[in-house]
């Protein structure tokens, strides 16, 4: 059973914040947002991000020209710090993930990319190389039998390889990207996301949502 509200510490998932606000309004409760050193304020918007700037950036970091919907997706994600993006099969999802990762790496931030299978770890790594990046200098792959400790800025891993690791392992990550995000309802994946307490930037990609 998955509990969305922690009665011990009063925490609730930020994705439910709009429902909490509506509840307060319906019952005429007052509320206040207090700035957090990691997250800032809820619904924070990055005014420095522009669609034209995102287009130019994506073009500069990849040898493939981005499509309009890819630019729109990356722009929306960077503008709001956290987004769930619907990206069907063959829509160029990895280019969007790659662009987000490159943006954060250039700002000295560490990124954790979580995928469901070993083959997707390898595919993501290969795609990043195909886009023209020196992946060996920045990315580390984790799945069964591979070393989990690394100084690399970017880790591409299956969730099965890391969900049992202690919270301190996740402390260095500023960014998390979840592929096949519709699977993130499972307790193991929720455990990973909860341990990423310092990750202000959270992006999910999925080809489908089941409405739950």
PLM regions with names:
Residues 144-155, 170-172:
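Conserved motor-coupling elements within RecA-like helicase/translocase cores
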Residues 111, 118-145:
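Conserved helix-turn-beta segment of the N-terminal RecA-like "Helicase ATP-binding" lobe
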Residues 2-6, 23-24, 32-34, 38-86:
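Conserved pre-motif I regulatory segment
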Residues 65, 79-104:
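Walker A/P-loop
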Residues 88-89, 94, 110-121:
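Conserved strand-helix element at the start of the C-terminal RecA-like helicase core
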Residues 159-211:
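SF2 helicase catalytic motif II
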Residues 9-32:
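Structured, non-catalytic alpha/beta "coupling" segments that mediate domain-domain communication
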Residues 68, 94-99, 118, 187:
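Phosphate-binding Walker
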């Amino acid at each position: 059973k998955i509990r969305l509200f922690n009665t011990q510490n009063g925490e609730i998932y930020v994705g439910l914040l709009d429902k909490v606000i509506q509840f307060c309004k319906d019952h005429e409760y007052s509320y206040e947002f207090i700035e957090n050193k990691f997250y800032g304020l809820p619904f924070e918007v990055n005014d420095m991000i522009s669609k034209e700037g995102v287009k130019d950036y994506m073009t500069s970091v990849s040898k493939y020209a981005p499509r309009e919907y890819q630019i729109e997706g990356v722009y929306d994600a960077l503008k709001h710090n956290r987004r769930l993006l619907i990206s069907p099969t063959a829509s160029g999802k990895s280019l969007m993930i790659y662009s987000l990762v490159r943006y954060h790496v250039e700002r000295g931030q560490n990124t954790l990319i979580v995928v469901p299978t070993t083959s997707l770890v390898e595919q993501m790594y290969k795609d990043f190389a195909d886009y023209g990046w020196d992946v060996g200098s920045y990315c580390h792959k984790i799945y069964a039998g591979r070393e989990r400790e690394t100084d690399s800025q970017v880790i591409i891993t299956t969730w099965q390889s890391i969900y049992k690791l202690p919270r301190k392992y996740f402390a260095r990550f500023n960014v998390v990207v979840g592929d096949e995000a519709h699977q993130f309802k499972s307790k193991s994946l929720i455990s990973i996301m909860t341990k990423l307490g310092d990750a202000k930037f959270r992006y999910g990609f999925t080809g489908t949502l089941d409405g739950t």
